[in-house]
């Protein structure tokens, strides 16, 4: 199968050019002008459009069981939504397994979830929910099998203490893996939450008040220091929501510490006022939405390079689930927002089209740096000969209003309802195959491939 994309502006993280792009047998074969491929081939006219590498979303939660509920997107509906939003690769954060389970247990479970459902290519982050000799011995074997990043939690049921974190950091570093972490101070949150519940203060706004930014920032600072103690172990902070935590990361980077950070569209574009709306329960996620001042600080990090990745933390629970389970109490509400379909369009509209970032920086945030950090470069995140033919075509001339009824996930609402975006995803190709075109999903379940990722190699800081 040959596909020739003509007349578009091809953009990579290191530059852009108006040129044509030839994909053959799922692989980029040639870029340039006046390409004359052998017949037969499909021709796609991208006049006036940007031709970007397909998005790489390194933070999703599909089919996750959080005890009180299972998310309503499985690996078909979740990756279908991703494809329709220009994302061609996801790395899913696996949920917790049974108490005392081995690392391999959850990998086998999740490979079963995805095998016949995923529309796009996928991998997983391991999850370390307890520490013992068997777990530590498993890590290098898992890395050899293509799982080169693992997540630690400082909050929730399987939070690790500082000694366990140090053991994990050391072994992951020795094994060629990147440590990712959900950083929030669990004890401080539990104390604040108990105060509010005792006082009968259970409305959605108290979710945010029970998890102040200092809880997140303290945990970030602690992880930075523990990583240094563990031999300068590489560290990746997920879903950053505030400027104080970013300040700590800037300081670590200035001291040449190997730390990287992601944020998400919700922390750039939504704020804590959402909790005071009639549907405030739909915005329950952790860390919570912050104020506009924190948004501005994050946008500075997006613009000046301090933030490395924009992912989604897509974790969808329906409003029916939220209301039935919570009964109006924030502390009982399952956490998470949908967004895997909207990430690329929202960042393009609010970043590129406003002049906050260049098209090249857009690529760096949404595909190139995620691919580099998580062992997929140059197969993913790049349009060059030999790379996978993963492409998203965006037309900057089109304006669209986000409406849930036009989205492809399995949620019954969108936090982005009514947002107007300048720029539209008009086509998505995965390994040269069109899986979304002009509003219509054309992919199929099970075509996605499991990606064995390379051991961690730090990009140049």
UniProtKB/Swiss-Prot annotation:
Its EC number is 3.5.2.-. Carboxylation allows a single lysine to coordinate two divalent metal cations. The keyword Plastid does not apply. It catalyses: D-5-phenylhydantoin + H2O = N-carbamoyl-D-phenylglycine + H(+). It comes from the Bacteria. Its cofactor is a divalent metal cation. One of its GO terms (cellular component) is cytosol. A divalent metal cation 2 binds at residues 151, 182, 239. CDD domains: D-HYD. One of its GO terms (biological process) is pyrimidine nucleobase catabolic process. The modification N6-carboxylysine is found at residue 151. One of its GO terms (molecular function) is hydrolase activity, acting on carbon-nitrogen (but not peptide) bonds, in cyclic amides. Homotetramer. Catalyzes the stereospecific hydrolysis of the cyclic amide bond of D-hydantoin derivatives with an aromatic side chains at the 5'-position. Has no activity on dihydropyrimidines. The physiological function is unknown. Belongs to the metallo-dependent hydrolases superfamily. Hydantoinase/dihydropyrimidinase family. HAMAP family: D_hydantoinase. NCBIfam families: D-hydantoinase (TIGR02033). This is D-phenylhydantoinase. The gene is hyuA.
